[in-house]
Amino acid sequence: MQKLFLYPLNTFFAVLLGLLFTFFNFSYFYKIPSYNDIFRIFIIMLAYLFISIFFLKRKKINIIPNERLKNIYKPLLVISSLGFVIELVLYGIPLLAQGGRDEYKSIPVLHVLFYSILICSIIFSSIYGSAKSIIISFAIALVISVLFFTRQMLMVSFMIFMISMFIRYSQYKKIYIYILFFIFFLTVLFSFLGDIRQQSAGDYVDNYVYMIGGANENGTMLGTALYWVWLYIASPIYNLYLNFNVNNEMADACITYNKVGDCFSPYISNVVMPNTISKYIGAEQIDIESVVQNLNVGTGYAKAARLFGLAGVISQITLQFLFYVIGYILTPSRVRVVYTIYFSALSFFMIFDNLFVKGEFFFVFIIIMIIGKFFSSPIKENFEKKM
């Protein structure tokens, strides 16, 4: 059962879930997928299944209690919390700002660092910490998510928690009940944050999600909370279908990005390179095609599909696998479980977005490696003996 929660099988089932959601007719905006659409998604799923069968025949993961790593969440939580408090003092609260998060300014680079450190705190508390430490770190994450409208942080945090809990307590049957409860809680909270974000932007109306999602009679029967979930899982897959079709229909898919029609440069800067770095060097950020303008999320594969079609997506999956292998080798053995769980959490969200290239999520890998190196060094050993 562990394999179902870990990369790459968790991504396989996430993509399968997205595919299945697009078969439900809940919106006037979207059509049932064509055979070509289904075939392309099927190939993506086969790629992850191939990696699982032939390359990652992982054994059962056991989380060994570690007193050194158990309390590392505390300094991480303090640093990130202080950083966010400073931002709130300097720039105000996005929740109360006119225009919401879209017009909010933050401390360059440091905001990304605070974000990454907070996620690290959640990772280590979920894997090694007590119930108290988990509650504290999640309470802080929840507050930050609401104040800054960072639903991605909240979703990734819950996924990290669920994977960690399942691995830590998989021998107990009650863990399945707890996981279902947290999924339900996340569903309700997700829809709540979606509503208050639109309210802060000043464009909220009753049953807002029905309006932006083009809900038909079947869709309204779901209720707003479940319709939010269906819309945010299905609409990226629909947009992925569209980007595949646009690439297939255009004679030169990249002529809109540069005069020579070069696809390679935008592929590197948008699909492979962390966006914090690509923005710093001035690389062009491309936009994907979307069926509905305001629902412009297209999974983590849409940009690759827009540039190179199915070949671009398969290349992306291959590069992602190589990244996992190289990162696993470079990560100190003491924290490889942490690395695996975090990578698995991000890979699950490929049905929403490519979080691997988002700076705030990418730099978490570096922090994990630094912590692993620090706790494996002679300096740390001597320091702990003196303590």
Label each residue range with its predicted role.
Residues 2-14, 68-77, 130-136, 176, ...:
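Membrane-interfacial loop-to-transmembrane alpha-helix junctions, especially the N-terminal start
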Residues 190-316:
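Small-residue-enriched transmembrane helix-hairpin modules in multi-pass membrane proteins
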Residues 135-136, 151-159, 174-179, 219, ...:
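Hydrophobic alpha-helical membrane segments of integral membrane proteins
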Residues 91, 95, 110, 293-387:
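Hydrophobic alpha-helical segments
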Residues 11, 15, 42-46, 80, ...:
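Alpha-helical transmembrane spans of integral membrane proteins, capturing the lipid-embedded, hydrophobic core
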Residues 32-35, 53-168, 183-201, 286-287, ...:
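Membrane-embedded catalytic interface detector for glycan/lipid assembly enzymes
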Residues 1-82:
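A structural signal for hydrophobic alpha-helical transmembrane segments in multi-pass membrane proteins
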Residues 55-58, 121-129, 237-248, 321-326:
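Transmembrane alpha-helical segments in integral membrane proteins
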